[in-house]
Design a protein with these regions (language model features):
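Acceptor-binding helix/loop patch of EC 2.4 sugar-transfer enzymes
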Residues: 66, 119-157, 198
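Short His-centered aromatic/hydrophobic patch
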Residues: 98-103, 122
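Carbohydrate-associated surface elements
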Residues: 172, 194
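Conserved donor-binding/catalytic core segment of Leloir-type glycosyltransferases
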Residues: 217-233, 239-242
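Nucleotide-activated donor-binding/catalytic signature segment of Leloir-type glycosyltransferases, i.e.
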Residues: 264-285
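Short alpha-helical donor nucleotide-sugar binding micro-motif in glycosyltransferases
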Residues: 284-285, 292-297
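Short hydrophobic beta-strand element within catalytic cores of glycosyltransferases
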Residues: 314, 323-326
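Conserved acidic donor-binding segment of nucleotide-sugar-dependent glycosyltransferases
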Residues: 338-351, 359-365
Length: 403
């Protein structure tokens, strides 16, 4: 197949789960003998316009303004369409696969691209993500944002309706499609996400030595999280849990990786609550160091408040042998809950999180999991190879039907 992969976010240009899914799926499809051409954003034209990542994996970046707004939106519609048409003239695609609605909207409704068989990956509802971003500290959303969100919702429905198949990573996401867009369930296909098992693995030097290397206290329970620092991730609530607890202050340490618009707010919270000895900000963690932090931690914590369509960090941590404590939000129960329901918080509040983390410290042996068991759970269920196999099987059947 000659596949055009349309993605607003793509690893390593950006961090985050959706970009990694697009990257690893593309990479595995190339290894299966397909030609994959990725069309993605290039804010302010800072990255190379065209790049050959592997023998049959090419990335084409279309220029966009740095700041989001109407100009950004219109530029993406126009420039993604232009890039797709130009690439199609040279290559002749027989499949379009998009991972976000905006990047697909320009190409899909312009000829001759609109005639190419099309499938879509639904990671999360576009309009809900937008509303969460626009919500202020008091929990209120401007009316203008609500109007824009209505438009986004309808635009996404048009994209999903046009798709021959809609791929999701979880039953939770499949349920969102049914509840929000009322599309027939037979259009939706759940396929497993993947994990780089050769990169996310057990520490070679042992956890204690790794803690020393990373300057993590040996006499405290190490809780690690890495997220985009935005409101829906629940990092504020995790910090609140430490504020409420002398046990966590004295016997625990929280390591926060990642960047985002809340970074300064979160740092101010830690300072105001006098938590600087208990809560550490690591900033953006390099790809080389990320597995080391998973390996060194006693537990990974996922305090998500809203919209967790899958959670690749769960697989990454467990592949390193480190169990995950998490809120029961979105698709999280489909991984963490299946492994062990006792690792789920009762809810998303700081009190819910505090009680569980204190219990972990006070009854550490009750939460001790064999690292081999954690890793085996991932090995048996998730790999990028399995994902590519499932995707290939589904779309090859579609293309045969379309001929």
């Amino acid at each position: 197949m000659k596949i055009a992969m349309l993605a607003d976010v793509f690893f390593p240009d950006t961090v985050g789960g959706a970009g990694r899914v697009a990257y690893h799926l593309s990479r595995q499809l190339c290894r299966k003998g397909h030609d994959v051409h990725v069309l993605t954003r290039n804010p302010e034209g800072k990255l190379s316009r065209q790049q050959q990542v592997e023998d049959d994996l090419f990335v084409y970046r279309f220029k966009l303004p740095a700041k989001e707004g109407l100009r950004f939106f219109l530029s993406e519609l126009r420039n993604s369409s232009t890039a797709a048409k130009k690439a199609n003239q040279e290559i002749g695609f027989n499949l379009l696969c998009s991972h976000q609605s905006l990047v697909a909207s320009g190409p899909l409704f312009s000829r001759p691209i609109s005639r190419i068989p099309f499938v879509h990956f639904f990671h999360s509802p576009w309009h809900e993500e937008y509303l969460i971003k626009k919500r202020n500290s008091e929990g209120k959303t401007p009316q203008s944002a609500k109007v824009i969100a209505m438009f986004m919702r309808e635009m996404e429905k048009r994209i999903l309706s046009k798709a021959l198949k809609i791929f999701v990573l979880s039953s939770y996401s499949a349920g969102q499609i049914a509840a929000i867009h009322h599309l027939p369930p037979e259009k939706v296909v759940k396929i497993p996400a993947g994990i780089e098992l050769d990169r996310f693995r057990f520490p070679q030097s042992g956890k204690e030595l790794l803690k020393k290397e990373l300057n993590i206290a040996l006499d405290k329970t190490a809780f690690f999280t890495v997220r985009n620092l935005v409101p829906r991730m629940g990092i504020e609530t995790l910090i609140e849990a430490f504020k409420q607890s002398n046990v966590l202050r004295q016997k625990g340490v929280l390591l926060i990786g990642g960047e985002g618009l809340l970074r300064k707010t979160l740092q101010a919270m830690v300072k105001d609550y006098d938590l600087e000895e208990s809560v550490k900000f690591l900033g953006r963690i390099s790809e080389n160091d990320l597995p080391r932090y998973y390996q060194a931690a006693d537990f990974f914590v996922l305090p998500t408040r809203e919209l967790e369509g899958f959670g690749l960090v769960i697989l990454e941590s467990m592949a390193c042998g480190t169990p995950v404590l998490a809120t029961p939000i979105g698709a999280i129960p489909e991984t963490v809950g299946v492994f062990d329901k006792n690792l789920l918080f009762e809810g998303t509040s700081g009190e819910n999180i505090r009680r569980k983390l204190e219990d972990v410290i006070n009854r550490f042996e009750s939460y001790r999991f064999d690292p081999q068991v954690c890793r085996k759970f991932v090995e048996e269920r998730y790999s990028w190879e399995k994902m590519a196999d499932a995707f290939e099987k589904e779309v090859m059947g579609l293309l045969k039907t379309a001929v």
